[in-house]
Amino acid sequence: MGKIRIEKTYNGRSPDDCYNAAPAALEKAGFEIFKKREIAWLVIGHRSDENGQIQASIGARPPAISATATLSVSCDNLESENLQEYADAVMEQFEKELGV
């Protein structure tokens, strides 16, 4: 099972900003939204392709003016290095949605 975790801090962005950007970012990267947990600032998505089901989630945490967002991407049938393209696609869309 492969897994990638990327954590970044976004100065001037709140956890709410990150949470609000996450659904569009995941969808634009080809993921279907599976679950949203507004109180936890967490959005979970998945997609299926020839490699099986790939899971991705974006979560955020305070402080309010410098939120930290965490992207996790995993798949039972792929190694971590093969998941990098999916993580890169989500991060690119996420940062576009945040306007950074």
Model-derived segments and their meaning:
Residues M1-V100:
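Ser/Thr-rich, low-complexity intrinsically disordered terminal regions
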